[in-house]
Amino acid sequence: MKKFFIHIYMFAAAVLLAASCETPLFIEPVGDECQTVLQARLLTSDSLHTVHASYSLHDSVIPADDLTIRCFVNGQLEAETSEAGRMDIEYDITTDKRAAYRFRASIHPGDSVRIEAAGPHGVATARLKAPDAIPVPEVTWDNEIRRTESGSTYSVIRFRINVNDIPAQRNWYRISARARQVVNEYDHSSYPIHEGWYKLIDREMDVDIDNTGDPLLNPDGREVEKWRKDYMANKHNFFTDELFEDGSNVLNLAGLARDYKYLTNMGFASYCDYMVNISAIFDLQSLTREDYLYSRMLEMDNFSLSGIGIVDRLFSEDAVLPDNVDGGIGLVSVRSVTRVTCDLGTFKPDIRSIFDYDNWPPVSPTDL
């Protein structure tokens, strides 16, 4: 079966075969013996990009390690690489099936992009255009104390993000969040390594965002379960402008305060003071329709409700995923990113209770 990631259809075929024991079903391979599969999601906010490449055979998938990848932006060659690696992604069992080609290129909203993969089986080419970028949104926030069923309390940061639609066209979006931590250290020992305040850590981390209070992202208010794929909960926060076309909409999101303040992989000295600045970073991604449909279909795959496979019920025939690779198969997309940073404050925690994140004291003017 020479279709891009149609394991949905193959599963349905296996079910039919198991249910038809009296009549053997023979599947004859069709199409080319070997096809180049390209997958990539390029972001205008990144300078380092990755193209995943495989060879799809009739009975297996293997990494395409012998390609030369070229990236053209507005007709000009931006990058070329023949160095194939692997993505070290925990819990991803498909990493040994894909070669990863990394290159640096500058891509902006509205740019025309062409990705070429040249190898012994010919040249596979993907042509795409970076969508327009969404205007920079206004973000406000406040703290809220919530109570668990057992009566204990915890702190939540509520965000209100006023999104303005790109006018005069249909649009598809996604919002994601990260936390930025800047930790400064003041050494009071007799022989300090650094004089005065010294920047010890400056890092960003992915954080979960709660969309249960937003009717656009999660109309049913479904809570995301950590170990369960739930298409309806929209964990990755995709949305369209269908309900606010050419207008604006306020996204209501929330995050645990401790997720933004969690200080991992560092030690604390009793003779030092620490000052921590916390920021929330939101990326508003503008997608093509094909990228949106592909991403949502991947989320739908394997989603079950009360033991019923939703995909098997919805698709009565082959599920056709978007494909924009000439001379091969796959989907290469580019997303235009609008980034906004929200300062959540600077704190001076006591090292004796530094993990009591909900009660960190804010920095006073005398500490600066």
Please identify what each model-predicted range represents.
Residues 22-368:
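A sequence/structural signal for flexible, mid-protein segments enriched
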Residues 2-9:
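Bacterial N-terminal signal peptides that target proteins for export
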Residues 18-20:
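C-terminal motif of bacterial Sec signal peptides marking the signal peptidase cleavage site
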